[in-house]
């Protein structure tokens, strides 16, 4: 018996927003440095790795980049292999970006908006074809993403040809460290 999941493919379109966000604290010097690198990677359509310890504020370091991307009309996705991480991150994102239409997609949710700003599990990327200008991948080292070639392919096929990818993790796989140029690895050793 085959286990087949059907996905509705979201039609790709562009739409900008102001992407105002509220952050209840000021980023540290290290966090600001990482945030600026994220914006540059989005602007230049680069792949970078944010290598920071757990609790370093990786989610909040994304905010300036999200704002920049949405103001340009970019479609963005924040992706995690795990539902619990998607739920936790989506709460923080929705609390910060109060006026944004954000699709939260995982096995117990459904798409409500146009897919311009998505927080989802990696499996949900099958809904999108050459749609995202920017993809943030949290916990890139986590199972099943790290071991499943079809999920890695879903990341590629959901992205536009010219796109930015921001990998985020406290424990990067050796293969990822070897694939990303040293100057595109932002390492934050402390909280």
Where are these regions (language model features)?
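Walker A/P-loop
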Residues: 43-67
């Amino acid at each position: 018996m085959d286990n087949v999941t059907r996905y509705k493919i979201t039609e790709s379109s562009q739409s900008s927003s102001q992407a105002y966000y509220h952050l209840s604290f000021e980023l540290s010097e290290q966090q600001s440095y990482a945030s600026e690198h994220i914006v540059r990677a989005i602007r230049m359509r680069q792949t970078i790795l944010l290598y920071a310890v757990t609790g370093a504020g990786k989610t909040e370091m994304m905010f300036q980049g999200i704002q920049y991307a949405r103001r340009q009309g970019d479609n963005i996705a924040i992706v995690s292999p795990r539902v619990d991480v998607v739920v936790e991150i989506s709460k923080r994102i929705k609390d910060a970006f109060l006026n944004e239409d954000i699709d939260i997609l995982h096995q117990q949710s459904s798409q409500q908006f146009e897919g311009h700003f998505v927080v989802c599990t990696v499996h949900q990327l099958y809904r999108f074809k050459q749609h995202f200008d920017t993809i943030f991948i949290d916990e890139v080292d986590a199972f099943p993403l790290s071991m499943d070639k079809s999920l890695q392919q879903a990341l590629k096929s959901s992205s536009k040809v010219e796109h930015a990818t921001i990998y985020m993790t406290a424990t990067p796989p050796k293969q990822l460290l070897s694939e990303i140029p040293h100057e595109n690895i932002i390492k934050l050793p402390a909280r």
